[in-house]
Amino acid sequence: MKTNQLKLGLNFFSRFTRYLKPVTNPFRPPDNKKPVSSSSTKFVLSFDGGGVRGLAAAVFLKALEKETGFPISKHFDLFMGVSAGGLSASYLAFNQTSAEELEAFWSVDNLNLSMKRTFWDKALYFNNKPKYSNAPREALLKKHFSESFMDESAKPLALLAYDIERRTPLLMSSYGERRYRVFEAVMASSAAPLFYPTVKMESGEWLIDGGVVDNNPSLIAYVEAKKLFGADRIKVLSIGSGVNKKRIDGSASADWGPMGWLKNDVLGLLLESQMDHELLMALIREDYLRINSPMHSINADMDDSSDSNLKMIRYMGEMWWSQFGDDVKKFLEI
């Protein structure tokens, strides 16, 4: 039964990745080149989406940095992310920033700024509008990335979004044929429906959070690394954002309308697919390591930036290091 499920999954993924081919951009500089191929082992770091729970990955990676004495960028050849994970991937890859600095970026002040709500925001939310405005987080991202393009990234970087007009997933990368500004790509990849407005890119696309089609982009990251490097061996470290084990009352759900499903985290349900994990376990079991765990005392809401919730998210990241630290060092051949 499981073999048939994996075959169906592989068939679905082969059709899904057809839509990830870059579109030619006449404005791309002709001298921009892809990284040189190599037959050596290449390491990929992939981040799930998960809103404020992205802090846990930063805490975990800071522990890895402390253990090795090197910034995270020194250990990986490709960074991949979706939604909040796209922010983490971009932050680490673009300027080879340390995980300690990434953790600082996930501060309460920055979170509250990116999720700032005015009186009118609240009024519009109850009038069927997005919960937050894009303006505050755009200002925050521009402060760090300025107007830079993805192809200026110090390390290969890829983010997943979804093109709502073409109804296709879209991969934005530092090595593709179309150029994207980093702040725009991060905003688009994390424009979660209900929370943020659709993002109109400078190149014309209307994009939303890529997590609506794949909240664990590790399999896409593996495929991209194979195409990009041509390496004999690709190793993927995939970092999640916690697993929601809260029971849903099946009989009660039969009577839920739109508000009932929203109240019971329908978006979270859509983002919990384990397909990528199962496929990678079948394809490259020894070269794939997944960091994740159930959420204990953590609010599953993606925008709960309360002190108590962030404290528990930070604790989850610390527990990941206690549980997976030795495995990660062995995996990275440190």
Segments predicted by a language model, with ranges:
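C-terminal helical/tail subdomains of lipid-metabolizing enzymes
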Residues: 2, 6-16, 37-40, 197, ...
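Non-catalytic, mobile gating and regulatory segments of ester bond hydrolases
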Residues: 8-42, 103, 107
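Surface-exposed acidic, glycine-flexible loop patches that form ligand/cofactor-binding
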Residues: 30-37, 68-73, 142-157, 226-230
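Patatin-like phospholipase
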Residues: 42-46, 51-141, 181-186
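Extended hydrophobic secondary-structure segments that form protein cores and membrane-embedded regions
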Residues: 44-47, 77-83, 157-161, 235-246, ...
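Conserved small-residue
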Residues: 50, 85, 141, 159, ...
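Surface cap/lid and interfacial helix-loop subdomains adjacent to catalytic sites
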Residues: 130-155, 249-279
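Active-site gating loop/helix substructures
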Residues: 151-227, 259
